[in-house]
C-alpha cells in the first residue's frame, strides 16, 4: 500500500478497509472499476453512493495543497458505475489561479479515461461556485447528482439555479461529448504524437485553441492534460494543470519530470504558452517544448 493511504484507510470501516487494502498497490491512481465497486459494496453492505462517501478519505489522500493545507477529495461516477477519484492541487508559492479543484481533478480523470457522461459527483465539501460552473459544462450537467456527507442528494440544478452554460453560447456538444479535431503534425516522436492525439480530443468551442500538454518522467511514463474550456471562461481547466494533477494522482513527484510538451492549434484565438510556462517553471527545471500545428 502507498504511504499516502496508511493513515486514511484507518478512517474506513474495518470490513471495507480489509477488502480495499489489496487494491491500493503501487499502481493505484484513484480508479475503481464497476466490478470493484460492486465487490466493495457487497462486503461493506453499502450502496454505491454510501460507498463513495465512505471512500472520500482515500480520495482526499491524493491531494497536494501546500497553500491551504485543506484536503478535498471527490469521486466522479461514470455512466457504467466506475469511480474516478480526484483531489485538489495547489502550486507552492504560485498564484491561486493555478490551483486544481477536487471536482475538476475527478472529472478530468474520468475524461482522460474515456468517459462520455458522469452521473454523480461525491465530494467531502460543498462544491464552490467555480466547480459548480465547471460541472455545468458537462453532458447533462444540470442533472448530475451531488452527494455530500450529512446532506440530502440533490442535482446540480439545486446548487446552480438559473445557470449560464454552453447552450447560451450556442454550443450543442458540451464537455465529455464524443468529438475530435483533426490536427496535422509530421513526427515520429512518441511524446509529440501523444500530444497531438490529446489536443485533437480537447474541448475549446469558445477560442478554438485546441491544445494538450504531455509530461514525460525519468522512467519514461507520460501524463497528459487536455484543454477544457468553460462558457464562463475563468473556470476553464488548462492542460498543464490537468497533466500535473494526473501526475500527482499517480504518486509521482514534480522532480521526476524530464520533458514537457505543449501542442496547440494555429487557429486558436488565444495561446496557452504563457500560462503553461508559468505553471511548469513553478514545479520543474525543464524547458517547455511548444508546437503550433494546423488543423486539417
From Swiss-Prot:
Active site: 103
Pfam families: dCMP_cyt_deam_1 (PF00383), dCMP_cyt_deam_2 (PF08211)
Chain's role: This enzyme scavenges exogenous and endogenous cytidine and 2'-deoxycytidine for UMP synthesis.
GO BP field: cytidine deamination
InterPro entries: APOBEC/CMP_deaminase_Zn-bd, CMP_dCMP_dom, Cyd/dCyd_deaminase_Zn-bd, Cyt/Deoxycyt_deaminase, Cytidine_deaminase-like, Cytidine_deaminase_bacteria
Molecular function GO terms recorded: cytidine deaminase activity; identical protein binding; zinc ion binding
Name this protein carries in UniProt: Cytidine deaminase
Keywords carried by this UniProt record: Hydrolase, Metal-binding, Zinc
Subunit structure comment from the entry: Homodimer.
GO cellular component labels: cytosol
Residue sites binding substrate per the record: 88-90
EC number: 3.5.4.5
Cofactor: how bound: Binds 1 zinc ion.
UniProt-listed Gene3D superfamilies: Cytidine Deaminase, domain 2 (3.40.140.10)
Assigned protein family: Belongs to the cytidine and deoxycytidylate deaminase family.
Binding site for Zn(2+): 101, 128, 131
Superkingdom classification of source: Bacteria
Reaction(s) catalysed by this chain's protein: cytidine + H2O + H(+) = uridine + NH4(+); 2'-deoxycytidine + H2O + H(+) = 2'-deoxyuridine + NH4(+)
CMP/dCMP-type deaminase domain boundaries: 47-167, 186-296
